[in-house]
Each structure stands twice: as C-alpha cells, then as structure tokens.
Swiss-Prot record:
It comes from the Bacteria. SMART domains: HhH1, TOPRIM. The lineage of its organism: Bacteria, Bacillati, Cyanobacteriota, Cyanophyceae, Gomontiellales. Disulfide bonds: none annotated. Keywords: DNA damage, DNA recombination, DNA repair, Metal-binding, Zinc, Zinc-finger. This is Recombination protein RecR. May play a role in DNA repair. It seems to be involved in an RecBC-independent recombinational process of DNA repair. It may act with RecF and RecO. Belongs to the RecR family. Residues 82-181 form the Toprim domain.
Length: 205
C-alpha cells in the first residue's frame, strides 16, 4: 500500500477492504472516520465484533445464526411445523422474516452448489434437510433460492432428492415466484416483492 499511509493505518485499510462491498475508497473513508472517534467508541465496536464472533454460532436444527444451541425460530411453538423454507444463507432468513408473511420453519444450506468454486452437495447442509423432511411432519418444502445458475442447480438437485420422499409422505416441493432478474439475490429484494413471491409459489415437477 502507498507510503502516504502510516503502517497502522495501512493495515486497518487493508483489513476493511476484506469486507464485502468495501473498496479502497470506502475502506479509507471508514478508517479515517474511526480514527476520529473517541477511544471508547472504537473499543465498543471492537468488543461487539469479538463477542459476536465468539458467541454466535449455527442452530443445530436449521443452521441459521444463533447464540443458543437451537434458534428462536426453531423453538417458537407458534411457527408452522408443516412448512419448511430452504434458503442459501442466514441473510435470506432475515429478508424473508422482514416480510412478516412467512410463519413456518427454515433450513439454511450454508451456500449453493458451485463446481467452479469447489462447492459440492457434501459441503452444504443437504443431508440434514433430507433427514428433517423424513423425520418431521413437513407438508411443504419451499425452495427460496436466488435465480442464479448456482441457485437453479441447487434447487433442482434438492428437488430431485426430495421427490421420492415427499411423494411417499404426500408432501410437495414448491419454489417461490421470483420477481427478480436472473442472478438477482434474494436478500436485495424488497419486502413487497418477497411477499408476492411467497404467495405466488408453484410446485416443482
């Protein structure tokens, strides 16, 4: 990095650039802003980061982010046990919860099948999904995966795995009706679009 920065500042900017969506200019702006803040604020930020990293893990049931062994959604008796919404990661759970239209349970895959990145089905939480569907009273599995190439691959792969199981149980696999362009991310859709996508879901053949 340019010698215009002192070494500690250069290191801070480099680390900030590792964050998603943060380029060199944004990293510089954030770093300079932090240096102007009182020590107490910077220490509070650092402490919050450490606590989140140390205390937040994955729910043992659905693999959503949780500070407890089982997350609030999985523990809630008011949630519909008959519907299970499959998403790529926790950002999608947050986006769907904001719609206030979905009242079932979730299953977080932890990513998407992507041979180019070396991510196969075995790296995702697909087998636990199959076990949940086979062992619980799930009547509908909703595939809420972004319509990218990786998303389509993952959706169709899981649908094929679930097909004999859901047929045996009299259940169904559906997918949400995206109002997104190909490659659009679920987390960036507004609440109205997501709510309509849930309402307009259709069964996968």
């Amino acid at each position: 990095m340019s010698t215009v920065y002192t070494r500690p500042l250069a290191r801070l900017i480099e680390q900030l650039q590792r964050l998603p969506g943060v380029g060199p200019k944004t990293a510089q702006r954030l770093a300079l802003h932090l240096l102007k803040r009182p020590d107490s604020e910077v220490q509070a930020l650092a402490q919050a980061l450490l606590e989140a990293k140390q205390q937040v893990g994955l729910c043992s049931v659905c693999f959503h982010l949780s500070a407890e062994p089982v997350c609030e959604v999985c523990r809630a008796p008011s949630r519909d046990e008959g519907t299970l919404c499959v998403v790529a990661d926790s950002r999608d759970v947050i986006a769907l919860e904001k719609t206030r239209e979905y009242h079932g349970k979730y299953h977080v895959l932890g990513g998407l099948i992507s041979p180019m990145e070396g991510i196969g089905p075995e790296q995702l939480h697909i087998q636990p999904l199959i076990q949940r569907v086979s062992q619980t009273a799930v009547e509908e599995v909703i595939m809420a995966i972004s319509p990218s190439i990786e998303g389509e691959t993952t959706t169709l792969y899981i649908a094929q795995l679930l097909k004999p199981l859901t047929k045996l149980k009299g259940a169904k696999v559906t997918r949400i009706a995206f109002g997104l362009p190909m490659g659009g991310d679920l987390e960036y859709a507004d609440e109205v679009t997501l709510a309509r996508a849930l309402e307009g879901r259709r069964e996968l053949d």
